[in-house]
Amino acid sequence: MKTLIVAALFCTIGMALADDTPPPPPFLAGAPQDVVKAFFELLKKDETKTDPEIEKDLDAWVDTLGGDYKAKFETFKKEMKAKEAELAKAHEEAVAKMTPEAKKADAELSKIAEDDSLNGIQKAQKIQAIYKTLPQSVKDELEKGIGPAVPQ
C-alpha cells in the first residue's frame, strides 16, 4: 500500500509540474474522469499526512464511491502487499551483495522510508539530506543495487 501512496504522490507532483494527467491506479481503470481527478486531489491534499493517515483517507474515500470500487480496491491492496513482499525480497538480495558502507546507508534510508510518523515530504527531505552526504561510490552502489534512492 505504501508503494501506491509513494508512486501516486510522485505522479501527482509530476502532474503538477508537467500539467499531465497520470494514468489512474488499476482499481480506478475505466472510472469516470471526475472520480480519477478526485483520487489525485485527495492524494495532493493528503501530501502532508503520514502513510497510515493517507490509507485511512483512501479507505474512507473508496467507501463513498459505491459500486464495485470497494472490491476492486481491496483486491488492489492485496496485490500491492504481494508486490511489496516481492520487492522486499529483491531488496534484501541486493543489499546482501553491497559493501558495508552501502549497507549502512541503505539501512538509514530504509528506516526513514518506513517511518510511519513522517509524511512523504518529511521523508523525502530527510532522505535527500542523507543522500547528499554519501560518497559517490556509495550512491552508485545503491543505485546499481536498488535504483535511485532520491527522486530526480
Curated annotation (Swiss-Prot):
IgG4-binding, as annotated region: 49-68, 118-137
Stretches for region IgE-binding and IgG4-binding: 127-146
Temperature dependence: Resistant to heat.
Highest rank taxon of the organism: Eukaryota
Pfam families in UniProt: ANIS5_cation-bd
This protein's UniProt keywords: Allergen, IgE-binding protein, IgG-binding protein, Secreted, Signal
Name of the protein described by the UniProt record: SXP/RAL-2 family protein Ani s 5
